[in-house]
Amino acid sequence: MNGFFGQSIQARTELDLIANVKNQIVGAKDSNPIIGCVQDGVTGAYLLTLDDVSVDSEEALYLMSRSENPKFEKIKKNKKYSGKEIFSTIIPEGINSMKKNFEVKNGELLKGSLNKSTIASKKNSLIHYVYDKKGGLETRRFVDDTQRMVLNYLILRGFTVGFGDCFIDKDTFKKVKKQINDKLLDNYFEISNMENQGSTINPETYEDTLQASLNSLGANTYKVIQDNLEKTNNFHVMTFGAQAKGKGLNIGQIMSCIGAVSVEGKRVKKKVNGRTLAHFPYNEDSALSRGFVASNFLEGMKGYEYFFHSMGGREGLIDTALKTSSTGYIQRKLVKALEDLRVTYDGTVRNSNGTIVEFLYGDNGIDQLMQSENKLSTIVLSNKDIEEHYGMSKSELKSSKSKESMNSKYVKDLIELRKEIREKQMDSMQNYGTIESSFLLPVNLYRIMSDYTDSKRKSKNDLKYEYVLEKIEEILTDNKTDLYSKRSKFQDKDESHSKKLFRLGLMEYLSPKKCVFDYNLNKKDFDEIVEDIKSAFLKAVVQPGEMVGVITAQSLGEPTTQMNLNTKHFAGAASKSSANMGVPRIEEILSNSKNIKTPMTSLFLKEINDGKLGKYVNNHLNTIKINDLISDAEIYYHLFDDKDNELNKKLKSDGVDNPFYLNDKKDSSLFPWVFRIELDRETMLDKDIVLLDVKTKIVLFYYDIVQDMKSMKKEKKELWENIMGGVVLSNKDTSDTPTIHIRLGLNNFDYPMIIKLLKSFMNDVYLKGVKGITGSDHSKEIRILFDEKTGAMESKPDYENVITAAGINLNEFRVLKGVNQERMYFNDVNFVYKTFGIEAARSILVTELKRTFNAGGAGFNYNHLVVLTNLMTYTGDIVSIDRNGTSKMELDPLARASFEKMMEHFVNAAVFNQKDRIKATSSRIMTGRVIPGGTGSFELMMDTEKLANSEFLDDEYQGRTQFEGFRDNALFEDIMGDGEVNVDFLT
């Protein structure tokens, strides 16, 4: 074990403050607690606070004796106490939490049981509220007392999950098995139905449909298990009651079925001779043969199921092993790129050179430790609901002696602000299918208002409408809540913009109607609330000297690693298996790759419900070859004689005419080789293709071949040089079977050559498509719509047509009719930068990083993304987060050498006489200097002359003032107990 000993007073003080657990209860990554009860602690808290739990006075005293400040006076002899009463003795006074089935009032647990959401490291849990109101020391005590009390209760009561808890009753077992068998039969039906559709269905759609169907089976069976498991079952207590360990998925895999195994986000592929395993027939697509495990862990897997399950598990283990190194390297690159960023005394974020990277940290200037999630209900309410909930009625206006004009203006302003935030939320993330109503604010308004909420309280009716509005404006403009140090007109506007969400929160939680009639507040109480909000905001503003760059690097680096490590816990869950695709994409974005692997364009229509137009645009962009339309292809050698044979009859019966010649030779008798190609009518109609298109594209294809003949490889050149002429004929689009004849005259031939020619015509002739676009997909995505007049959310979600193209070709997209040119979305950051500029590129960076992390289940505050993207774009060019990007940041030689290629940087610095000003974090650490951040961002100056001329005075009224001397470290004294060791360095 290693020991770390502070070598100076400053070092010991920083260790004492920074490394102290009570100061690390909330994490900056997502502003949520990172310390809380886990596993047995959560289970014990749940069991102790159940409604039917009671303990006698002796047990109560035993449990309370484990707490730091036991309140024994509350316990009377020979009396029973509920678990809620016992636990309430350790909740600090003044803590309030009111949720649907849970209520704590002034430190008393009145309703509900504790679980993971209330006692663990979760947002707006009791731990979060205690920390927010009472601080770190009281929170540390509360967590310690909780752990001691609930674990000792578990010792008294006993709790274990055993083999007997794995069994379910016969009726539930039959219900689960019936669901599985029914779904497997449905799966056979779906396969038959799709196979009958033949070429009209996309193979990927076919696979995705089958996979989604089987994934839903797992969720349904797990729900049956959850609904029918007895409440006393220890699995139920641990997983569904306390939510301490495991999920419905884990319990379901033990008792019902393991479910569909996923490899690389897809069903198990038929890799060996058209089979997944040797146990199954050729080209078998049924659920059981493609990775569905119908058995559960209790009854054990069949042989082939075990193989499938191993495939899913192996993928997770390999990903974990291979990607851990790359994710660790990502975090190191982030740390080295961001380590110099700090908040300065004018509120800006600057690097070691003093260059401004951000005018306001994270776009809101708030310390990430101090933010809290608040629900803003107005986001989802209609105009009428807002008027009803936040505007006063005529009787209330009369009762409170308030002006109707003032009330109308307040409601109107609230509706306008809500509308603006709705639009900005959807546009910023290009997500129109969901609306979020919970936001991080610098003040926990819900907690503060809960402390003062008491509808039964009697109070003087002295709180006026206009006074509430004045105080809301005062909170927003008071110097305690300033975000910018120097104020000017444009900064006033910026400050107002940065506080928009906070303004909406204040207008909702401090609305005059709620304050006067719901909270029943008087003027004195309201003033206390205003002061609480001001002081909470002041604490929340980020402090000068804060090293926000390193905080951002760790907040983004840790989720990147976690995205990858979580995989092994979900072997068999499709959604988690595909999440690992996020790590390569994150590397791609941070490295500013010029050629990304999967360039994508999202196209939206002007008329969002025009499905016909969406289909047309998709068909235009989709790459379509002759091979995609073929129902049959044959090769004939026909000499064009008049003999009455079967071949002549067959070719004449096709009724082909209207010849398109390949070159100037137009004698059809010279072209004996016939490629007879039958096309599928339904596919042609679906893809909007006619025979004229096919013939034209074949002739143009041959023309391009002839033009490129000189630059061709020898083998391909010999193939096409053999053609001396040809003609393309077709019947009519109205014919029963659309047919094409390609007749060729060859100088010499062999059969492999004939086959190659036919394959080339089938696979290389593109009938539709756009250069640079390898494919496209037409889908309908949910779009939430709000009524312009009423502001209400539509009861049924609307769907808009979205075309996703695999590739980018802006010139072609610009001329597409019906496409909304203002809503095109490209995922290639470099392309956006070159075309639209640095601000557009910054926006894409934020959106792409957010989407990638969200897909992997990683959660962190938006502010961290803003810091990273601002660093990548503050120079006006895109700075990559790697060794190439550091050169654009104008770092000094020592700082550059601390990252990579150390000797190269030192040699260059020596050859070109470069100077290091020792301002960067790495440079100062190398030279033993204090870094220019935190307590090193300022210096203390002492007037020694005043000190020399001063004298000590006794205060005859207060007594002599005692000064504490320097404290020696007890640990050092024990180690160096012989007294001969030089300990001067301690002081």
Predicted features and spans:
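Short alpha-helical scaffolding segments that buttress acidic/His motifs in well-ordered protein cores
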Residues: 146, 150, 255, 307-311, ...
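Polyanion-binding loop/helix "lid" in catalytic or ligand-binding cores
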Residues: 17-37, 286-322
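Active-site-flanking segments in enzyme catalytic domains
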Residues: 14
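Short, charged/polar, low-complexity loop and linker segments
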Residues: 120-130, 196-201, 309-315
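Extended, well-ordered alpha-helical scaffold/bundle regions in very large, multi-domain proteins
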Residues: 143, 149, 153-236, 240-247, ...
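Secondary-structure capping and boundary motifs in well-ordered enzyme cores
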Residues: 34-35, 119, 138-139, 172-179, ...
